[in-house]
Amino acid sequence: MKLWKRLTALCLSVLVCVTLLTACGRKESADGRASLSVCVGETPATYDPIYAQRIGDQTILNHLYENLMRLETGENSQAIAVPGAAKSVDMKENSDGTVTYTFRLRGGKWSDGVEVTASDFVYAWQRLADPATGSVYAPLLSIVSGYAEAQASGDISLLAVSAKSSTTLVVTLTGHYDWFLREVCTSIATMPLRQDVVQRLKQEADAANDNLKEDETPRRWWSDPTRLVTNGPYTASAEDENALTLTENTAYGKKLTGPEDLTFCFGDTQTAEVLYDQGVVDAVWPLTEEEMAEQMEADETWQAEPVLETYSVMFNCSRLEDESIRKALSLVIDR
């Protein structure tokens, strides 16, 4: 399928690393800081990495957090995994057929100055695998040894993810999967989280919910993004119902390749189009196919880009427990 988008909005794909923001048009604010404003659709449904399903939500989180690996464009425009929060990774094939990956972290820091540790990844991955959280992205870790047992028993310590030291993370897979680094270790769902921060913000949210009024929305630990502690190139500095502003995370420890200030605007497609035409924002996504097709004919700054996407159908039907029925359905498909 094709996703139609503006030339200036190429940076919005969740598979594109933050460095591509330099390819977008940048403006300078009154104080000389480079800034970029982007419309990303509806107001985010969540800032919790294990629940973020919308591309807009994932795009924001991709700028707030940094995973073990990140994606870059390699030869033939293929996405390749390169070190992110990790500075190196080693792979060892074991005699029982399992494969062990050892990640050595680069010594990055969270936005509050605390060191990023291997335990932050252990906590995040165990939280994702926990059946109690009910994340649709949990199967990402199904190739990790102990995942099935953890899912069945609820004992997340069975997941073969451990901190050998504060800067060494060890992950054992059930076998060899060449897409592990590219797909799992760059995913929004496996981004690191600070357990102490999540627990503190959750306690505060629960306390606020005790006095919740009938017409108020229950608070979650992530409800105020400006209080999130992040390890990526940006941290949230301001939020209202129409936009979220990110500013450079000075504790990030790497040279920032994008603008110092990044604003994600929220609204419907019509609002986004008006803001773009008025020069309020630099890029918009998404628009309806009709609007985009019309604009492409009249505006040379538009172009079509192919995007690879995979969709799956999850059946919640007891009749499909019968293997013969599933085989019959499979035979119907003209391959």
What do the PLM-derived regions correspond to, one by one?
Residues 32-42, 99-104, 121-124, 169-170, ...:
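Short, well-ordered beta-strand elements
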Residues 53, 87-140, 170, 321:
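Aromatic- and charge-enriched surface segment that lines or borders ligand/interaction sites
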Residues 118-124, 166-170, 260-261, 278, ...:
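Alpha-helical secondary-structure segments
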